[in-house]
Regions:
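Conserved acetyl-CoA-binding loop-helix of GNAT-fold acetyltransferases
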Residues: 1-29, 52, 186-201
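Generic low-polarity alpha-helical segments
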Residues: 1-8, 21, 50, 55, ...
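Eukaryotic N-terminal low-complexity, Ser/Thr- and Lys/Arg-rich leader segments
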Residues: 17-27, 76-89, 98-99, 107-114, ...
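Short amphipathic alpha-helical surface micro-motifs
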Residues: 20-24, 47, 159-164, 190-191, ...
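Intrinsically disordered, low-complexity regulatory regions enriched in Ser/Pro/Gly/Thr
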Residues: 31-34
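Active-site/acyl-donor-binding loops of N-acyltransferases
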Residues: 42, 47-80, 169-256
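Amide-forming acyltransferase catalytic core, primarily the GNAT-like/NAT-type
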Residues: 60-178
Length: 256
C-alpha cells in the first residue's frame, strides 16, 4: 500500500514510465494531489521498512534524514523560571501559538529562499495543522489525566529579542515536553530552555526534547546540561521526487 502512495503523490514526469505489472492496476490519480516534489513520514518501525517501499520493486522509498535528539533531564521540584518571564518573555496559550506559527510560516518562506544559495532546500511550514495536530493528539490524554495545560510556548518580547521563541507539546506516556518549533538567539537560549524546563516540572515531565537542534545552538548544549544522540524511533524519512540526488537536498527545520 505504501508503494502505491508515490503513484498518487508524485508528478507523473518524476515517476517511472510504466507501473509495475505485478502490482495490478495503478491507483487513481486524484485532482490537486499529484504534483508533489517530495513526501515525508516519521517511522516507528525502524529505518528499513519504508526505505523498501519505493515506486517500483527496485527503487528506494523513504530514507531516514536527520534523527538527532537533544535531551535535558528534568529534576523534581519547583522551578525558578518565572523570574525571566515578566516583561521579557510572553507565555503563549494555544491561540497565541497558532498566531505565532502563522507569522513564522510567512517568514520561513523568505528565509528558505535565502538559505538555498543555489542548492536545493525545503521546509515544512508550521501551518495548516502541520504543528497543531500534535497538540490535538495529546490533548485527549492530558484531559484524561486531569492536566490543565495552558502554556504551549514562550516568546521573547524584549526589544531586538522578539524573534526568539519556542512552542511545545506534552507527550504524556513518555513524560516528555517536546519542542515543536524553535527559533532562538544563542544569548537567550539558556533562559528559554529554563522556561521550558519549568513547564515540564510543573506537569511532572521527566525530560525536555528537541529534534535536530540548530547548529547555531549546538555550543550551548553542554553548558545547559543537554545530551545529543541518534534516535531509534520517530525517524524523519524523505522521498525526493525531483531530478536532484536526494542526498544533496537539505531538509531545513527538521523538527518535531
Amino acid at each position: 500500500m505504501m508503494r502505491l502512495l508515490h503513484w498518487v503523490l508524485a508528478s507523473a514526469d518524476s515517476l517511472p514510465a510504466t507501473f509495475p505489472e505485478e502490482w495490478g492496476p495503478p491507483p487513481t490519480r486524484v485532482e490537486r494531489v499529484g504534483n508533489g516534489q517530495c513526501s515525508v513520514l516519521w517511522s516507528d518501525v525502524g529505518p528499513n521498512f519504508y526505505r523498501r517501499c519505493g515506486p517500483t520493486p527496485y527503487d528506494e522509498g523513504w530514507v531516514v534524514t536527520g534523527a538527532a535528539s537533544t535531551i535535558w533531564r528534568v529534576s523534581k521540584g519547583s522551578s525558578g523560571s518565572s523570574k525571566y518571564a515578566e516583561g521579557k518573555w510572553l507565555w503563549l496559550d494555544e491561540a497565541g501559538a497558532l498566531q505565532l506559527w502563522e507569522r513564522d510560516a510567512q517568514n520561513l518562506t523568505e528565509d528558505v529562499q535565502l538559505a538555498g544559495g543555489g542548492s536545493v532546500a525545503f521546509v515544512i511550514l508550521p501551518w495548516n495543522d502541520v504543528v497543531t495536530y500534535q497538540n490535538r493528539r495529546h490533548q485527549f490524554v492530558l484531559a484524561l489525566q486531569g492536566i490543565d495545560f495552558r502554556r504551549w510556548g514562550v516568546m521573547a518580547v524584549d526589544g531586538d529579542s522578539a524573534a526568539s521563541f519556542a512552542t511545545w507539546t506534552i507527550d504524556y506516556p513518555s513524560r516528555t515536553l517536546m519542542i515543536t518549533r524553535l527559533d532562538c538567539q544563542v544569548a537567550l537560549f539558556a533562559e528559554l530552555l529554563d522556561l521550558a524546563v519549568g513547564v515540564a516540572q510543573e506537569h511532572g515531565m521527566d525530560k525536555v526534547e528537541i529534534y535536530n537542534l540548530p547548529m547555531s545552538l549546538q555550543s550551548a548544549v553542554a553548558a545547559a546540561g543537554g545530551v545529543t544522540g541518534e534516535r531509534d524511533e520517530h525517524l524523519p524519512s524523505l522521498k525526493w521526487y525531483g531530478n536532484e540526488n536526494a542526498s544533496d537536498v537539505s531538509w531545513l527545520l527538521n523538527e518535531r
